[in-house]
Amino acid sequence: MTDGILGKAATMEIPIHGNGEAGQLPEDDGLEQDLQQVMVSGPNLNETSIVSGGYGGSGDGLIPTGSGRHPSHSATPAGPGDEVARGIAGEKFDIVKKWGINTYKCTKQLLSERFGRGSRTVDLELELQIELLRETKRKYESVLQLGRALTAHLYSLLQTQHALGDAFADLSQKSPELQEEFGYNAETQKLLCKNGETLLGAVNFFVSSINTLVTKTMEDTLMTVKQYEAARLEYDAYRTDLEELSLGPRDAGTRGRLESAQATFQAHRDKYEKLRGDVAIKLKFLEENKIKVMHKQLLLFHNAVSAYFAGNQKQLEQTLQQFNIKLRPPGAEKPSWLEEQ
């Protein structure tokens, strides 16, 4: 009866083909790749031996894998170096073993959730905030893309106006009868170029600040969110495992397993609750920082664009001074994003 209950508790709900093999699921490829990556970093077996006869094989089934070329005529007692190598190999094996068990439990929990056969822990308020953050990030990325496009168009316009101003100035010297007309058109284009460079500096500052907010501040919070979601999956996986063991018989063998499962579950629960608190704090700080940054940047963008199209050069320059924006001279190296803040 004990074997039947334990076998039922360890059963994973995966479709089986007619030949008795487990059905391939979309998650199988990713799991196989993860296994390959872990095994690559496994213990170094260059100075160990491989048993070719399977479990319980005789000593004749040992295949030496060392680099020695001369046959050994007598057994050599193991030295301190061999003990250290075995200890390292054992530690690596334990790491791979724990990773494999954890991956199996998490994959089982994930599949159960996908197919509606298992329960998951849900913090509705926190998950709503996380989804809102992801949606906000997508919208800000769109604003960032449009801001970069505007910067490219303004730069192209400045190049055209500069070339047009030079052409007018050259023609004013070579056409005495139209010298005055070409002259004031050349001055107008030069003034537009100057104001355009000021506007371009303001827009560049706006784009740089949005880029920092999206790719650094929001991304940092989302990295913590990913860690929280992984911890939630592990927590639910070990919670389910503990519940299955609790429903089984209470003999001497299962009692030890139950205590071990309880300790492991508590460790994952503490990790989950800690990361949940970290996410809540980061979301709060992110919202405050976003409002502060965007209030400043939207005011800058509005004042600069309004002054430029109104032809108010003085107000345009005052806007840059108000936000401590310094225009870079032609050919100067671009400052880092920290210097631009």
Swiss-Prot record:
<dbReference type="GO" id="GO:0019904">
    <property type="term" value="F:protein domain specific binding"/>
</dbReference>
<dbReference type="GO" id="GO:0032588">
    <property type="term" value="C:trans-Golgi network membrane"/>
</dbReference>
<dbReference type="GO" id="GO:0006886">
    <property type="term" value="P:intracellular protein transport"/>
</dbReference>
<dbReference type="GO" id="GO:0000423">
    <property type="term" value="P:mitophagy"/>
</dbReference>
<feature type="domain" description="AH">
    <location>
        <begin position="121"/>
        <end position="321"/>
    </location>
</feature>
<dbReference type="InterPro" id="IPR010504">
    <property type="entry name" value="AH_dom"/>
</dbReference>
<keyword id="KW-0333">Golgi apparatus</keyword>
<feature type="modified residue" description="Phosphoserine">
    <location>
        <position position="72"/>
    </location>
</feature>
<dbReference type="GO" id="GO:0034315">
    <property type="term" value="P:regulation of Arp2/3 complex-mediated actin nucleation"/>
</dbReference>
<dbReference type="GO" id="GO:0034497">
    <property type="term" value="P:protein localization to phagophore assembly site"/>
</dbReference>
<protein>
    <recommendedName>
        <fullName>Arfaptin-2</fullName>
    </recommendedName>
</protein>
<keyword id="KW-0472">Membrane</keyword>
<dbReference type="GO" id="GO:0005543">
    <property type="term" value="F:phospholipid binding"/>
</dbReference>
<comment type="function">
    <text>Plays a role in constitutive metalloproteinase (MMP) secretion from the trans Golgi network. May have important functions during vesicle biogenesis at certain cargo subdomains, which could be predominantly utilized by secreted MMPs, such as MMP7 and MMP2. Also involved in autophagy by regulating the starvation-dependent trafficking of ATG9A vesicles which deliver the phosphatidylinositol 4-kinase beta (PI4KB) to the autophagosome initiation site. Involved in phagophore growth during mitophagy by regulating ATG9A trafficking to mitochondria.</text>
</comment>
<keyword id="KW-0072">Autophagy</keyword>
<feature type="region of interest" description="Disordered">
    <location>
        <begin position="46"/>
        <end position="83"/>
    </location>
</feature>
<dbReference type="InterPro" id="IPR027267">
    <property type="entry name" value="AH/BAR_dom_sf"/>
</dbReference>
<dbReference type="Pfam" id="PF06456">
    <property type="entry name" value="Arfaptin"/>
</dbReference>
<dbReference type="InterPro" id="IPR030798">
    <property type="entry name" value="Arfaptin_fam"/>
</dbReference>
<feature type="modified residue" description="Phosphothreonine">
    <location>
        <position position="76"/>
    </location>
</feature>
<keyword id="KW-0597">Phosphoprotein</keyword>
<comment type="subunit">
    <text>Forms homodimers or heterodimers with ARFIP1. Interacts with RAC1. Specifically binds to GTP-bound ARF1 and ARF6, but binds to RAC1.GTP and RAC1.GDP with similar affinities. Interacts with ARL1. Interacts (via N-terminus) with IKBKB and IKBKG; these interactions inhibit activation of NF-kappa-B.</text>
</comment>
